[in-house]
């Protein structure tokens, strides 16, 4: 394949289309396949050759693919992205013309994936040249992928086996990757609705479902819906193949903060196994109610946490750490009427700066409001009066 002529290549394309061989056709238009490195196929003007062998719109689609290999050979990703746009547009025309059949779904997967990758590369080249802002090309790519999604979602005529609806989840996952990259998470909402209401949602491939749950779980985390985030991210982690260490680690980066907010602390063995020791001091600090250690741990690994987009989520652990510290005060004093001064002493011991009795009341009021403490503040007696039953409810029942 790395040395075939243009005529041999086009003959293979013709046969794949003629026999409705989606998998072979997908390889012949994919940048994951070795033919793209063949100098004989990297052509600046392949239109005439393609028109001699292929019917429209496939002639236009594969001519654009050969121009794309030429552009990539010259490291011109802006041109490669333009060519890939033509490929997807031509494919869409052919795809819509395939009534009640879905043999071309693998082709759609290949061209959609390459579109996203080239959009990303083109973005980087344009930003370096100062010609556009980050995400412009990705945003345009998303619009084109949405056109593909609409074609798949509106296929109501075909039987379930031949339905284009099988392509919906792959496209949703590609769109999620773009929306997370350009920070437009609100655009995920209608896509989540479409998948959750689909009667195929449990029948897609495990790999696609893992990717979907991973992104929806991350979105739930940002929306502070920690129970749903835990459910979706746990599904992704548990179903991810054990050999995919890198992917499991990536899921854990988001699952760990969610679990911690729900009161489940990771073991040191788990953190070691997945090279996530950045969380070890955070875990220790929250468990012990040690605000001093928590602030130090967040500061020490701030760059890593910010890069992963979880720093602000981890900041929410401060309220849990207050709760654990104040629970220690309660266990130490063994009374249901706790002097506010006792909490003030505990906070000063943790080097909380400029803390006074008003701040103690403010923190306690927050903890009571959020359901972390069952009780009330008696301002007259300067005491916290806690419930005799379960004054510090388990975190998993509160969040």
From Swiss-Prot:
The keyword Protein transport applies. Disruption phenotype: Conditional knockout in bone marrow increases lymphoid cell numbers but decreases the number of myeloid cells. Decreased bone marrow cellularity, enlargement of thymus and cervical lymph nodes with an increased number of lymphocytes, increased lymphocyte numbers in peripheral blood, decreased numbers of granulocytes and monocytes, enrichment of transcription factor Spi1/PU.1 at the promoters of lymphoid fate regulator genes, increased expression of lymphoid fate regulator genes, and enhanced lymphoid differentiation of hematopoietic multipotent progenitor cells. The keyword Nucleus applies. GO terms for biological process: negative regulation of gene expression, epigenetic; negative regulation of lymphoid progenitor cell differentiation; poly(A)+ mRNA export from nucleus; positive regulation of B cell differentiation; protein transport; spleen development. It is found in: Cytoplasm; Nucleus, Nuclear pore complex. It comes from the Eukaryota. Highly expressed in bone marrow and haematopoietic progenitor cells but is almost undetectable in mature blood cells. One of its GO terms (molecular function) is double-stranded DNA binding. GO terms for cellular component: cytoplasm; nuclear pore nuclear basket; nucleus; transcription export complex 2. The modification N-acetylalanine is found at residue 2. Residues 210-391 form the PCI domain. Its main location: cytoplasm. The modification Phosphoserine is found at residue 45. Required for B-cell survival through the regulation of the expression of cell-cycle checkpoint MAD2L1 protein during B cell differentiation. As a component of the TREX-2 complex, involved in the export of mRNAs to the cytoplasm through the nuclear pores. Binds and stabilizes BRCA2 and is thus involved in the control of R-loop-associated DNA damage and transcription-associated genomic instability. Blocks the activity of the SRCAP chromatin remodeling complex by interacting with SRCAP complex member ZNHIT1 and inhibiting its interaction with the complex. This is PCI domain-containing protein 2. It comes from Mus musculus (Mouse).
């Amino acid at each position: 394949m790395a040395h075939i002529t243009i005529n041999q290549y086009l003959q293979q394309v013709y046969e794949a289309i003629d026999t409705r061989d989606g998998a072979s056709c997908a390889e012949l238009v994919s940048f994951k396949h070795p033919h793209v490195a063949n100098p004989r196929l990297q052509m600046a003007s392949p239109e005439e050759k393609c028109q001699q062998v292929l019917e429209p719109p496939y002639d236009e689609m594969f001519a654009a693919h050969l121009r794309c290999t030429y552009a990539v050979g010259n490291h011109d990703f802006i041109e490669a992205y333009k060519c890939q746009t033509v490929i997807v547009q031509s494919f869409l025309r052919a795809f819509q013309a395939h009534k009640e059949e879905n043999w071309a779904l693998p082709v759609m997967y290949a061209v959609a994936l390459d579109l996203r990758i080239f959009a990303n590369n083109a973005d980087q080249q344009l930003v370096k040249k100062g010609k556009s802002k980050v995400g412009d090309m990705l945003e345009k790519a998303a619009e084109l992928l949405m056109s593909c999604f609409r074609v798949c979602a509106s296929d109501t005529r075909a039987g379930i086996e031949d339905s284009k609806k099988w392509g919906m989840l792959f496209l949703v996952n590609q769109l999620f990757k773009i929306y997370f990259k350009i920070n437009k998470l609100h655009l995920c909402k209608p896509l989540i609705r479409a998948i959750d209401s689909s009667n195929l949602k449990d029948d897609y491939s495990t790999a696609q479902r893992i990717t979907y749950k991973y992104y929806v779980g991350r979105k739930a985390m940002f929306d502070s819906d920690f129970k749903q985030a835990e459910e979706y991210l746990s599904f992704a982690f548990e179903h991810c193949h054990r050999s995919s260490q890198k992917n499991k680690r990536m899921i854990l980066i988001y699952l760990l903060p969610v679990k911690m907010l729900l009161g489940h602390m990771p073991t040191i063995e788990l953190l070691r196994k997945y090279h996530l020791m950045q969380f070890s001091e955070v875990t220790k600090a929250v468990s012990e109610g040690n605000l001093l250690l928590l602030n130090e741990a967040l500061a020490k690994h701030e760059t890593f946490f910010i890069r992963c987009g979880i720093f602000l989520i981890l900041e929410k652990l401060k309220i849990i750490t207050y709760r654990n510290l104040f629970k220690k005060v309660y266990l130490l004093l063994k009374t249901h009427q706790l002097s506010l001064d006792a909490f003030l002493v505990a906070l000063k011991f943790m080097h909380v700066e400029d803390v006074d009795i008003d701040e103690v009341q403010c923190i306690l009021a927050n903890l009571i409001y959020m359901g972390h403490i069952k009780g009330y503040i008696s301002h007259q007696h300067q005491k916290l009066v806690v419930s005799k039953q379960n004054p510090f409810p388990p975190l998993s029942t509160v969040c």
